[in-house]
Amino acid sequence: MNFLKFKSKITNKEKIYINKNIKKIEFSLCSFLSKEFNIDITNDIDIVSGFERDWSNIPGDAEYLTRPINDIQCALVLYICNQLKIPVTISAGKTNLTGSATPMGGLILSVINMRSPNTLVNKKNKTVQVAVGTTLEDMRTEILNISNQSLCYPVDPTSRKDALIGGTVSCNASGFIPGEKGATRYWVNKIKIILPNGYNKKITRGEFISKNTQFNLQCGDEKILIEVPDYHRPKIKNASGPFTADDNEIDFIDLIIGSEGIFALITEVEFNLSNTADKYLDLFITLRSEQEAIKLRGFLEKKNIIYDLTALEYFGYNCQNYMLHKKQLFKDEMSVGIYLQYPVIDELIDNSIEKWIKLLDQSNCNIKDDDIILLNSPENWRMFFEARHSMPAKALEKTKELDAISIITDTIVPYENFNEFINFSHSILQHNKIEYLLFGHLGDCHLHFHVIYTKEEALIINDIYQQIIRKSAKLGGVYSAEHGTGKRKTIDFLECYGQEAANQVQQCKLAFDPNNILNKGNIINIKGS
C-alpha cells in the first residue's frame, strides 16, 4: 500500500488560536511557546551558541533553541515555525562530521530531552522500543542488562557514547560489522515521524511500499504526492543521500532512514535485536603488505565467512607512526595490520582459534603463527585498545604541531575495483608529498585516507580530494559510506549523482516540506529559499 493517512495532535481550535497570535505585531516566539505550551525555548545567545556546531566544526548560526520533551511539543514547534517560515535544524548528539546538525539561521530543535518512554525490550519478539533522546551506548547496555545478556543491538559506531538514537536513524549510522548488518537501516522495524505541518504517523517496515515510485499522503484535507527519487544508488555500504526507488519500489521507512532530517522529524524508534554470541574471538594479524591484506579480504569473501565477522578493520600506510605499542603489534615498519573479530557460537574458543589458524594458513597471504596475536587476554586487549584509539589523538597532535588542517575521506568502491581505487589515491597523495595515514573498514572496502595538510597546501588538497571523489564515482562507488552528506559534501553529491538526481531530491523534499524549513542545506542546496 502506498497511501498513508497522517494525524494531528494539534486541534483545530489550537491552530486557530496559534494563527491568530502569530500575526500580532508584538508576537514573540519564545514567550508564546513557553507561556502557552510550557515548551523549553530560549534565545539566550550563550545557550544557543552551544548548539551551533556539531563535530564537523562548521560554523553555524541560530536565533532560538528549543528542547521539547514529547512529540506534541515537537508538533507545535514545527507547525508554528512552518507557518512563520522559520528554518528548523534538528539536533541530536551533534556527533556528525559533515555538518548535518549545523544550523543555517532560525531555530535549533534539540531532541536531547526526548527521553520518554523508557527503553522497553520485548525478549519474545527480539525488539526494543526506545526514545530518540537516549544515547546509543546507554540503549545497548540496557538491552544487555534487561535480556540477561541474551540479546544485543549490534550497530557500534565510534561515537556511540555520545550519539543519540534519533540521530543514528536520521543519518543511518554504521559501525564495525561488515555488510548490511553493520548499518542502522537493517535493524529499524518501526518509527514515528512528524512532518513540518505538525501531522504525525507511526510507520512499520513492510507496511507502506511505493507504487510507480510514488506515495500518497493525506494530512486532514490536504493531499500530498511524494515522487521518490529513482536515480541509481550503488548497493554497497552507502550514506550518500536518501534511499531511492531505482528498483521501482521502496519501503516508506527506508525513505526516511538516512535522509538526514530533510523530510521529517523522527520521534520514536523500534529496533530488531540480535542474539548475543557466547564469546568473541579477537585477533590482530600482521601482514607484509597492503596487497596481502586485500588478498585476505577477498579470500574470506570467497569462503563466505566475511559477513559472519563482527569486525574486519585495517591499519595500513603510516598508521604505525600514529599508534602506541606499535612494536608489540607489528613485525617491522613496512607491516600492515588487520583486527578481526569472530562471534563464537556453540563452539569452544580453543576450537575456534585452531580453525582460524588453519583458515589463515590456507589464504596464501604468508601469515605465520607468530603473525597472529590473540587479543582475548585483558593485557593484550588493553594494549590493542590503546593503540587503536591513540591514532586520532596523535593525528590531532600532528595537525596542531604543523598548524595544519585535516580531512578524512569516506569513499567506498566495490571490491572488484578496490585495488585500482586505493592505488590511485596513494599515488596522487604521495606524488604531491602530502602527509596521510590509511585505516578503516576493510570488510566493506571502506578505508579512510586521513590527510593532514598545511594551509599553504589547501588548494592542491581540494583538487586532490575532488579527484578522489570523481574516481570513486567512476569505479561504481560513492563519496560517503558512513558519514553522510550534511552541508560539507553537497558538492560531492552532485559529483557522484549529477544535477538531475539533486533535482529529484529537491522535488521530494519540497513535497514533504514546501517551505523548506527542515534541515536546510543538508544533502542539496535549494535556490531561492
Give residue spans per PLM region:
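N-terminal flexible segment immediately upstream of the FAD-binding catalytic core
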Residues: 1-79, 95-128, 158, 268-273, ...
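General beta-strand structural signal in soluble alpha/beta enzymes
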Residues: 40-45, 66-68, 88-92, 99, ...
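Conserved PLP-binding active-site segment of the aspartate aminotransferase-like
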Residues: 55-56, 450-457, 488, 495-496
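FAD-binding subdomain of flavoenzyme oxidoreductases
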Residues: 117-120, 132-296, 518
